[in-house]
């Protein structure tokens, strides 16, 4: 059996083809770009398709905004079993095709029912990509840069969000001020503009499809499925023959004590696996329940409560996107140097402190610039910590044999938590006010800090097999 020490030695001696590793990681991270793009494009399109389809009830509008979450949950649930059977690469190719098909389908939708159906199918693509892109990158990346490479997926999500926001703005930049509902419904903006917002998603979707056709299959999936020679060839291209031999031996050693077979979800509840599964699920849920996505999803309401008018709200939203991108770059530079635990501590403690201050500002009637700065601070804190690092950790803590199924459970939990967070914010805000709601999120962040301190080991610089031994054996 190859020991952890031997594995670390092979990591240090390997001469890596970093250009190749970065290339295949960036291609896989295109799934994150499409995830971010598809997630926010509906926000810019809503004022126009709402009038085109003559949606008048809050229930219809809410259904249009949230129906994709059903598909997200479905995609996340099936991703594990299907990727374990058919491979990570093939399922990412399917996700790329789904992104392309659904973007065109939404662009051509002739009625609201068809529009909703395509949105749900688009959610399936998001669920697949959100599960498989970070998993694939984690399985091809050398240990010493795995955190940085997996964090690229978060960077591309942020880039996708920004691209969608700017394309939405560009397409409607000439909309006359004070345009009436009737004018919008009968104008190019109401008839065709929103269709272009969805349809343009097909361009990066086809690029993602072409890129995934050219990258290799995950070597860890190949080794798990009895194709060690193919796995060795891919790993040799990444780090040379010595690295490949040691890596394949290490992968096989972690599988040797267990029969490699179809993984059932009941297998995840085995005593050896249960602890690591609970760890991954709680981290995924905490990434959502830390509250930051409320700021993205309800930015208009939050900024209006802070005293801003609609024109200034749009400017502030652009600032949030820019800060999100800038601090995601910061995360890329520190995730493999600073470690996972310190960044998770920074995110949970930093957000708790910021939310407490936001609560006092709301409670005391403080408006304007102080609130904007606190919101930007919260987004920056999240973007360099919990946003990328949670994805890194849940992509690397699960054992080889159950990684697909366990990732499916964790990512499904994340989407359920996202739905609960998004659904409950208006209810909580109405009952407790903005101040009480953000104080509640601060309390959740404190609990998250304590959970991380007691349960999350440092995974920086360790191979996936070393992490498995520490958490499971």
Q: Which sequence ranges carry the predicted segments?
A:
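Short arginine-rich
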Residues: 241-246, 469-473
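Short, well-structured alpha-helical segments
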Residues: 244-256
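Alpha-helical transmembrane bundle of multi-pass membrane proteins
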Residues: 2-230, 236, 257-473
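Extended, hydrophobic alpha-helical segments
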Residues: 235-239, 251-252
């Amino acid at each position: 059996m190859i020991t952890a020490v031997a594995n670390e030695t092979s990591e240090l001696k390997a001469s890596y083809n970093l250009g190749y590793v970065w290339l295949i990681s960036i291609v896989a991270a295109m799934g994150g770009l499409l995830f971010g793009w598809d997630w926010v494009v509906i926000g810019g399109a809503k004022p126009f398709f709402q009038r085109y389809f003559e949606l008048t009830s809050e229930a219809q509008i809410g259904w249009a905004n949230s129906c994709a979450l059903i598909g997200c949950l479905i995609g996340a649930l099936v991703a594990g079993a299907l990727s374990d059977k058919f491979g990570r690469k093939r399922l990412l190719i399917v996700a790329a095709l789904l992104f392309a098909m659904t973007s065109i389908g939404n662009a051509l939708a002739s009625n609201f029912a068809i529009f909703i159906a395509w949105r749900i199918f688009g959610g399936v693509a998001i669920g697949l990509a959100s599960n498989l892109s970070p998993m694939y990158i984690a399985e091809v990346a050398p240990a010493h840069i795995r955190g940085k490479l997996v964090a690229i997926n978060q960077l591309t999500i942020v880039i996708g969000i920004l691209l969608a926001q700017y394309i939405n703005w560009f397409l409607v930049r000439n909309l006359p001020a004070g345009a009436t509902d009737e004018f919008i419904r009968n104008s190019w903006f109401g008839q065709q503009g929103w269709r272009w917002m969805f349809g343009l998603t097909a361009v990066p979707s086809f690029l993602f499809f072409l890129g995934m056709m050219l990258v290799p299959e995950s070597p860890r999936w190949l080794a798990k499925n009895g194709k060690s020679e193919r796995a060795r060839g891919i790993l040799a291209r990444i780090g040379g023959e010595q690295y490949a031999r040691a890596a394949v031996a290490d992968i096989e050693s972690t599988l040797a004590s267990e029969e490699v077979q179809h993984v059932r979800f009941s297998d995840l509840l085995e005593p050896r696996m249960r602890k690591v599964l609970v760890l991954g699920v709680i981290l995924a849920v905490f990434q959502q329940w830390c509250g930051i996505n409320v700021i993205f999803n309800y930015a208009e309401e939050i900024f209006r409560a802070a005293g801003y008018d609609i024109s200034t709200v749009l400017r502030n939203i652009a600032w949030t996107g820019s800060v999100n991108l800038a601090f995601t770059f910061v995360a890329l530079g520190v995730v493999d140097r600073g470690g996972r635990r310190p960044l998770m501590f920074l995110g949970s403690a930093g957000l708790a402190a910021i939310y407490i201050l936001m609560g006092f500002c709301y409670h005391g009637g403080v408006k304007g610039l102080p609130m904007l700065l606190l919101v930007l601070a919260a987004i920056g804190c999240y973007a360099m910590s919990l946003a990328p690092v949670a994805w890194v950790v849940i992509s690397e803590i699960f054992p080889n044999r159950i990684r697909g199924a366990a990732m499916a459970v964790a990512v499904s939990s994340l989407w359920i938590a996202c739905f609960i967070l998004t659904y409950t914010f208006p209810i909580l805000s109405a009952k407790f006010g903005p101040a009480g709601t953000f104080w509640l999120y601060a309390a959740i962040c404190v609990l998250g800090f304590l959970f991380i301190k007691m349960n999350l080991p440092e995974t920086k610089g360790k191979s996936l097999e070393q992490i498995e031994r520490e958490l499971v054996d």
